[in-house]
């Protein structure tokens, strides 16, 4: 597999100077090729037999990135990172995929507070995720083998979730790049924070824990905006 990392900046929010500096350094530090995807270039990667969900157009910039990274990891594989400070090379982490039993390489969730908050009807699953948080991968950076049972189920669950949200998305499209359910106490955008990211990704990590590697260092989570 090519040692290529995808980064996304989607939506109409301008990138801050700090984010731009972080993006400029990712290739140098990771020792990997970086492909930067924007609204202007993303259509080049959408496969004719696998179009984006109808609801994509109504998403915020953040949730567009959540959707896109799942799509790219399934159809293309390779690395993904948030546009944050990276401290270490990724070359050895990519080498973990030399083992065919490894499907996803990432870093362990930092603490139990990083576990995605599922909907109330999934209380039992939520308890299991919180109990086993140390086995979950963080959402900020990872490397995926394409077209595995993990990524296939990821896309299936993502599109099913988007189907459920679609009627409300049409009524209440995102107001800004970081919109989420209840933002500022008034947002009617239907998707909660991590609603199409960790809420899908974390249960899959627990299901396919035997196919995970934890050989990636996390990005920096402070002072990145």
Locations of regions flagged by a protein language model:
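Short acidic donor-binding loop at the edge of a beta-strand
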Residues: 76-79
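Glycosyltransferase-associated regions of secretory-pathway enzymes
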Residues: 1-66, 71, 81-225
């Amino acid at each position: 597999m090519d040692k290529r990392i995808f980064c996304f900046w989607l939506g109409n929010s301008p990138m801050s100077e700090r984010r731009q500096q972080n993006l400029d350094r990712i290739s140098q530090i990771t020792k990997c090729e970086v492909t930067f995807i924007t609204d202007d270039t993303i259509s080049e990667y959408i496969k004719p037999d696998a179009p984006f969900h109808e609801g994509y157009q109504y998403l915020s910039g953040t949730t567009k990135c959540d959707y896109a990274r799942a799509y790219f990891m399934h159809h293309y594989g390779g690395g993904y990172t948030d546009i944050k400070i990276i401290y270490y090379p990724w070359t050895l982490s990519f080498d973990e995929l030399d083992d065919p039993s490894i499907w996803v390489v990432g870093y362990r969730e930092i603490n139990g507070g990083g576990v995605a908050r599922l909907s109330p009807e999934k209380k039992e699953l939520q308890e299991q995720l919180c109990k086993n948080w140390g086995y979950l991968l963080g959402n900020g950076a990872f490397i995926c083998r394409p077209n595995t049972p993990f990524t296939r189920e990821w896309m299936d669950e993502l599109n099913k979730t988007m189907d459920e949200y679609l009627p409300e998305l049409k009524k209440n499209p995102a107001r800004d790049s970081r919109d989420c359910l209840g933002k500022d106490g008034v947002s009617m955008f239907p998707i909660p924070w991590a609603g199409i990211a960790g809420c899908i990704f974390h249960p899959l990590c627990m299901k396919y824990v035997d196919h995970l590697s934890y050989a990636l260092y996390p990005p920096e989570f402070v002072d990145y905006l």
